[in-house]
Amino acid sequence: MGRPKKTALLVAQQIVEDISRRGNTVGDRLPPEHLMLEHYGVGRGTLRESLRYLELQGVLMLKPGPGGGPIVQQPDGGTLAATLSLLLQFENAPFSTIMEARTALEPTIARLATARIDDAGLARLAENLRLTREQLTDQAAFSANSERFHELVAWSSGNALFGYLFDALSGLIAGASMGITYPRRQRELTCEIHEEIYAAIADGDGDTASHLMSAHITEHTTYLEKRFHKALARPIRWDLDG
């Protein structure tokens, strides 16, 4: 049996439940402190601990000063990336762990995207392909656009867990990308296979999309192992930036 949850965490859970119940959206202010103290039946210190915890989780922004207070935010994959990096540091796991996970996950994600993507999702992928080609000579832009393609495919799978998990994995592998460069031919090949994956998804061909994604991630991993083995072998360290 686990330890009982602290009162502040229980209150934090109730605050999130109340946000959902009221249908609060990003930018909404929560009730003032005196009303929250009365509603949750706790002391000021406990309530503020709950709010600080939710701020760390990306649920709230605590705006100081008159007219401030807790404001609803949209959590993102950064918090998950920070938590995963902390867990993986304690396991002394190398960055190659992330590439192994991507190799296992992304073919399935591409197959799901083929069946579930909508017109808006296809348009976002097409725009990403255009930008990647347009900014091919810019190393930083190429890397960002390339990772963004995979994020878009993950969210197009219709599975929010895959979306957030991939956001986190993408954020973690970015930490290993420091110093990693891609020659012009490698960037062109990436554009080509991204375009082929997009075509398979647009055609509703799940088998081809899955096969192409598997080949793409395997080839990318082989390139990193050959050219940047030390980066992949480096242990993951806790990254609060996510």
Question: In which residue ranges do the predicted regions lie?
Answer:
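Surface-exposed helix-capping loop/turn segments at secondary-structure junctions
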Residues: G23-G27, A115-A120, G206-D207, F228-A231
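C-terminal effector-binding regulatory domain of bacterial HTH transcription factors
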Residues: T208-G242
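Short linear motifs at protein or domain termini
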Residues: M1-T103, A231-L232, W238-G242
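A broad structural signal for alpha-helix termini and local helix breaks/kinks
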Residues: Y40, S157-G158, F228
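Short helix-capping and inter-helix turn/linker motifs at the boundaries of alpha-helical repeat units
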Residues: R185-E188
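Conserved amphipathic alpha-helical segments that form helical-bundle/coiled-coil interaction surfaces
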Residues: I98-G179, T190-E196, T208-T222
